[in-house]
Regions:
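Glycine-rich phosphate/pyrophosphate-handling loop used in enzymes and phosphotransfer proteins
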Residues: 1-264
Length: 264
């Protein structure tokens, strides 16, 4: 009988996970019980606008699909930090709904999609760019990839090819501390002026509407900084989308309204 070398076994266990990403029960991906548990975190009626309290000055309108809690919180963490990329399609479907809600919720973007242009002129780019919040170089090295870019790429597959494209257009320009454990003010000061548009994307960002995306909306500091960097590069319109929003006592994200038209 063939005995697979230990490194091969370790590789296969990552490539073909043999346990639910949430509860660790047998079977790859996400088990039926955990799918139900994740669904319980979804906003009733579909994606809605979420607003942190206090709300950062630079934060654009942000739509989310669910609360960051329970099984969904564990799935997001497993995908991002534990290498469980097999949960990506499930999370991407939730992110796609939030992106769609942000597109529908902004009149200027609706008009841009209808006319296939934002600021005029000829461009090979679609009128809307989905821009993931950037990871630091250290995070990319540690994880081996950029999980949010992968997630955004999966999320836009259901949109028309001439409507929306993913743009890894932002980069971190200075060192920032881990946001965990910081309050709203601490998070804002930590990421303030920490991002910039990559030079090769500057022209496209300057003429396209942008949807800046993240996995979780907490205080809004990160999405707000990303939006600031895009505006500084001239983007005519910027909105935001995230899979889920935290619900924190004494200051956190609060649902503001349901997205027009509900879930796509």
């Amino acid at each position: 009988m063939f005995d697979a070398p230990a490194p091969l076994v370790a590789f296969l266990s990552l490539a073909i996970p043999q346990a639910c990403a949430v509860c660790r029960a047998g079977g790859p991906g996400l088990c039926g019980a955990c799918r139900v548990a994740v669904a319980e975190s979804l906003w009733v009626g579909g994606p809605r606008r979420s607003r942190p309290d206090p709300e950062p000055r630079d934060l654009p309108p942000v739509h989310t699909t669910a609360r960051f809690e329970g099984a969904l919180a564990r799935l997001v963490t497993a995908y991002k930090d534990d290498g469980r990329r097999d949960g990506g399609r499930f999370l991407a479907a939730l992110l796609a709904q939030a992106v769609e809600a942000s597109l529908v919720g902004d009149r200027r973007i609706r008009e841009a999609l209808g006319s296939n242009g934002v600021s005029g002129g000829v461009s090979s780019r679609p009128p809307v760019l989905v821009v993931p919040v950037p990871s630091s170089a250290a995070s990319r090295r540690r994880r081996g990839d950029a999980p949010l870019v992968r997630l955004a790429t999966l999320a836009v597959r259901g949109f028309g090819p001439g409507e929306v494209a993913v743009a890894d257009a932002l980069r971190v320009r200075r060192r920032v501390a881990d946001q965990a454990g910081l309050g709203a003010l601490g998070r804002h000061l930590n990421v303030e002026h920490s991002m910039e548009v990559r030079p090769r994307w500057a022209a496209d960002v300057g003429r396209c509407a942008c949807v800046v995306v993240d996995d979780v909306l907490t205080t809004g500091a990160t999405l707000g900084e990303a939006a600031r960097a895009l505006r500084a590069s001239g983007t005519p319109v910027v909105v935001g989308a995230a899979i889920c929003a935290t619900q924190r006592r004494g200051g956190g994200s609060r649902p503001a309204s349901r997205a027009p038209g509900g879930a796509p």
